[in-house]
C-alpha cells in the first residue's frame, strides 16, 4: 500500500523539469512521476534530478506513461506548444486545446481522484479547457494563475522599500496576461495599507503604482529576451500551491479558478486546501479596479467562446 503523497507532472520541458526538481527538493512527495511524449527526455531529467537523492528526503522518481499516473494526489500539466512567428494567440490556444484533448482524458482515466493543476499557457483558458474536458468538479481543477505574478509584485515592492518580501501582502488579479492588474487598494506593507505607508514615508502613491505595475508586467518579457524562457520562479510558485494542497493548509493564493458564472477561469485570492479550491476571497475594490476586473474577465470569456472544443 502506497504511503505518502504522489505528484505527477506532464511535460518535461523547461517548466515541467524545474517543477519536478522543486517538488523533489521540497520533500512534499514520496512518489514523483514525469510524463512526456519524448520518453528519452523525461528519463534524462529524472536521472539527473534523482542523482541528488542523498541530499533530500527519500522519494521514488520515475519517467512514466499515463498508466503511471494511478493514485496521484496531484497531476500538474505543463505540456503545450510554443507560439510560432506569425501565429495568432487564438491559433496557439486552439493548438494547445487540441493537445489537452489528448492529455486530460488520460489523467481522468488513471487518476480520477487527483487535483489537476494547469500551468501551461494561456493558463486561464487552458484551465477552463481542462475543467470542461475532465468533467471534474470545478474545485478540483486549478490553474497556477497569478501566483507568480503576485510574487513578482511583492518582490518589486520589497525591493523598493528594502523589506522582506514575505511581509508584503499584495495580489495581481484577473487574467494571467495583458489584462491583469495589481489590487492596489488591498495591498499591505506589514499590517499597514500601502497608501498609509507611502503617506508616512512621503512617497508618491500614484507614481509608485504606475512604475511598479509596468515593472511587474515587463518582468517575464525581459527574462525571455535574455534567456529565452522562464522556469525557476514558476516552479517555486507551483511548489507553493502543491504544498497548500498536500498539507491541507487552507492558504490564500491567487490561483485561477472558475468564476461564479461558470464561463471563465480567472485569478483572485482563493483559499486552497486538500480538495483544491475552498472559496474565493474577492477583496473590496475601488471603482477603477472593479472595472478592470470585469474587463479582464470579459477578455477571457470572449477568448473561451472562440475555442474549438
Across the structure, where does each feature detected by a protein language model lie?
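Rossmann-like NAD(P)(H) cofactor-binding subdomain of soluble oxidoreductases
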Residues: 89-154
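Gly/Ala-rich phosphate-binding loop of Rossmann-like dinucleotide-binding domains
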Residues: 20, 24
